Curated annotation (Swiss-Prot):
Name by which UniProt lists this protein: Cytochrome b
Gene that encodes the chain: MT-CYB
Residues involved in a ubiquinone binding: 202
Note describing how the cofactor binds: Binds 2 heme b groups non-covalently.
Membrane topology: Multi-pass membrane protein
Swiss-Prot/TrEMBL GO biological process terms: mitochondrial electron transport, ubiquinol to cytochrome c
Miscellaneous remark of the record: Heme 1 (or BL or b562) is low-potential and absorbs at about 562 nm, and heme 2 (or BH or b566) is high-potential and absorbs at about 566 nm.
Cofactors that this protein relies on: heme b
Amino acid sequence: MAPNLRKSHPLLKMINNSLIDLPTPSNISVWWNFGSLLGICLTTQILTGLLLAAHYTADTTLAFSSVAHTCRNVQHGWLIRNLHANGASFFFICIYMHIGRGLYYGSYLYKETWNTGVILLLTLMATAFVGYVLPWGQMSFWGATVITNLFSAIPYIGQTIVEWAWGGFSVDNPTLTRFFTLHFLLPFMIMGLTLIHLTFLHESGSNNPLGIVSNCDKIPFHPYFSLKDTLGFMLMFLPLMTLALFSPNLLGDPENFTPANPLVTPPHIKPEWYFLFAYGFLRSIPNKLGGVLALAASMLILFLAPLLHKSKQRTMTFRPLSQLLFWTLTANLLILTWVGSQPVEHPFIIIGQLASLTYFTILLILFPMTGALENKMLNY
């Protein structure tokens, strides 16, 4: 009998082993869809991004006009831009849900996969930040100024680092040029990291909602999960297209319709919605260096997740106390997101500080304690 090409060809064999004949736990739920959705988001963003880059000019005098030109004069330019801008929002929705799934079901115990995932998150955040600066509107300019300025909080070398990043003494043409370079480069870096992420995942195989070894009950990825993923794609593209076609500017800042002006500061400088929770951490500490450390810690704490796991059970499926904490953490992050969008005044300052404190308390103290307590409860 002739050998099956997809199983013998050196390249097709790799695709076959990771997308077609991949042994997959039969009981993985819809929460396992977000990985493939992130892949689709990345592909969409790279394609729309390439088309936008073809019409973009990375120069402070022309950037704003070139984006306006793309929307007005380029065939379907408005659609490409709207898909790219709102696609970023969906990218973040998917990655946050993907991370939430990982925390809930103990997927972080696959340490290499988890760590590459956290690095992917940080790279994605950097990409989104530099991308937001490119249209060169008011919020683009002031967002870049405020966030890059945070590096000046680093003792001794901070100011030098900031001026080196700016390529001058303020955010100007060199800054825009290098941000465009980075925004073009980073998605391809994300692609490479994604391959590493998947390589580590396929070493161990997927986790499942019960958190138990599922080797005795695996089914091929195709057709079962390829079909389930296709449903996921449709359910994501529907709201994305709805948003991009009906209210493309819903999630944007009206301030960005004004070209960047270094002489006029907007009344409220705030990032896109998907960074508001991090902005909440930053603002809840009155000291500059303290705020920067809180912001960094809020992300880097994810690296500690495997070390803070004290339960004998992997997932939270049968751990009601941990579930309660998990959903409290989720609500807490939503509160931080809301606070981040509000002006710095009473009562938002104290709410932000309490929410920040709660976030770290839950992750560093309450999760491990609850895990240990539930272990004890198993004995009775």
